[in-house]
């Protein structure tokens, strides 16, 4: 037994420097972060709606206590806004003592409720107002993450990737527990905003860590495709996982399960990454302002932003639109996103490998066009089955864009700047967050003002119009001084021009040459 323990400890010690184990840690962190991101999608609209109408019901009962005894048996049916169901209580007049007839106000209230289909909320104005409220709640996470990313990028350049990665775990655990026990809009908003800080740490540090250990362009693309598969699985599992547990167990259950999984991720990070050790970069990275002036980095970031903005606009608006037009039950609000999540997982895994062969710029261009066309088709759905094909197209196409653009960001830094990746993946995450910040907040307001179909039309056209810009990523030029370094046979980085047919193999030297001024 002691010998087997020693063997296990030796294997774990040797595995600390394994690239595959680091890839697994990043995969798991992105998986859990995006499960928490999307598990709230089917829960929040219905939960906020139930909170509001339970409060209204309590106020009505408090204002008219004298009517309680005389009208408790006069209802033929009672409609519950909490679970969208109608409870039948018996004959409307047979149970009245002394044959008394109900008051006019009570009779009017009963007629109003019984005319509503059992699965459709009747307060259309409340649902329209909820578009804005839910949109702002969803956007708060991305907005905070957007503001935090530049600082995390600079921090990783100074102290390395393990400490920010572990800090992301700690913050995400606190946020998950807050979600579980929050019972008001204000606390939900705080929990969602706090998640943005944790996500910034995990995303920037995780992608930067992968770029630093996978220096070959093809290997880096494959690794990031796998890591984005974790993101895809989180998006895939989150909505149905949340909606099913919410309907059959309660709001707290999905968040407590997630909190337990986050603890497991933290334990693995603590042992493998040793986050107490400061590991600064060996060379000074390119300033963030310089990277932001690079037009090729901006095009890649724009592709990530606008592609993800489509699904970000869907998250708060689609469940509310389904409640209005399809009379959907709570579990259907999350399951509707299942085709997009499955296809995103397929897209990231296929094009993580295929994009390197056919050209990442081409994959991104085609992906942007498919995203736009699929989004334009969503308002034509008449039931949940009509959402399957367009949602599948949206998810698959976003998988094409993300799995192509994430490696290109690292490639552009290798080609045109200093190969330090914290800042460039902060920019990539900023682009992702801008989509998820602008999307829900603007989407909720637009859906309220001009309707859900016009919202889909606007973002669909934007994606299609932006697509041709990806052509400029076909063969981005290298800076002159950087090209001289890349052509050096001692350069540890293997690069590939996407217009070439063959990859020039560069032998890896034992020692890295320091950057010359």
From Swiss-Prot:
Domain of life: Eukaryota
SUPFAM superfamilies: MFS general substrate transporter
GO molecular function: monoamine:proton antiporter activity; xenobiotic transmembrane transporter activity
Residues that bind serotonin: 231, 235, 308, 311, 315, 337, 344, 402, 436
Nucleus is among the record's keywords: no
Disulfide cross-links: 120-327
PANTHER family per record: GH10249P, SYNAPTIC VESICULAR AMINE TRANSPORTER
UniProt-recorded name of the protein: Synaptic vesicular amine transporter
Species name: Mus musculus (Mouse)
Gene name as annotated: Slc18a2
